C-alpha cells in the first residue's frame, strides 16, 4: 500500500516558499450562552480570542491582533459597560505586540495589519505597529 502522507510531505518541502503562519491567543472572553446563541440560556460561555501572524519574505502580516493591551490593564476603563457582559480575560504577556517577539519578529518590521472586522476583541494591533499599513474591511 502506498503512503500518501509521504507524497504530501515531499511536495510541502519541494514547494516551500519561506512563508510561515503562526496562531496566537490573547486570552478569552467570558459571557453567557444567551449573548451568543439568541437567548438560549444563562450558562457560562467562554470564547478564545485568537489572532495570526504570517511571516513572509516580503514582509510580515498580522491578522486582527486579538484583544488590546488595555483589556489586560483596565478592562472597564477601555471597554466600559461592555465588559460587564463580555468579560475580557487576558494576561499582559498575551498582547500581540509582545507575542510577535517570541517568533523573532520585530514589531517595527510588521508590514501590514489586516482587520477582518473592528470588534473590540480583534483590535489589539491597531496603533501598536507604527510602520504597518492597516487594512480594514471596506464595510468597516
Q: Which residues fall in each region the model found?
A:
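C-terminal regulatory/interaction regions
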Residues: 1-17, 35-38
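Short alpha-helical segments and helix-capping/turn motifs at coil-helix boundaries
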Residues: 5-8, 47-50, 119-120
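NAD(P)H-dependent oxidoreductase Rossmann-fold/reductase module
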Residues: 9, 16, 23-31
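Conserved beta-strand hairpin/beta-sheet module of binuclear metal-dependent hydrolase folds
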Residues: 20, 28-97
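Hydrophobic/aromatic beta-strand patches that form the interior of the parallel beta-sheet core
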Residues: 22-24, 61, 114, 135
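Short glycine/serine/threonine-biased micro-segments
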Residues: 25, 64, 122
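Active-site metal-binding motif and surrounding structural segment of the metallo-beta-lactamase
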Residues: 78-136
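Histidine/lysine/aspartate-rich catalytic loop segments that bind and position anionic ligands
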Residues: 139-140
Amino acid at each position: 500500500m502506498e503512503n500518501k502522507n509521504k507524497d504530501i510531505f515531499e511536495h510541502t518541502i519541494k514547494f516551500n516558499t519561506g512563508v510561515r503562519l503562526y496562531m496566537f491567543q490573547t486570552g478569552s472572553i467570558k459571557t453567557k450562552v444567551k449573548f451568543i446563541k439568541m437567548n438560549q440560556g444563562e450558562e457560562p460561555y467562554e470564547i478564545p480570542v485568537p489572532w495570526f501572524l504570517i511571516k513572509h519574505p516580503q514582509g510580515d502580516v498580522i491578522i486582527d491582533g486579538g484583544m488590546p493591551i488595555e483589556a489586560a490593564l483596565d478592562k472597564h476603563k477601555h471597554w466600559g459597560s461592555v465588559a460587564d457582559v463580555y468579560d475580557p480575560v487576558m494576561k499582559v504577556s498575551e498582547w500581540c505586540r509582545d507575542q510577535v517577539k517570541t517568533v523573532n519578529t520585530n514589531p517595527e518590521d510588521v508590514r501590514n495589519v489586516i482587520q477582518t472586522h473592528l470588534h473590540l476583541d480583534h483590535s489589539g494591533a491597531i496603533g501598536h505597529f507604527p510602520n504597518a499599513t492597516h487594512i480594514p474591511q471596506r464595510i468597516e
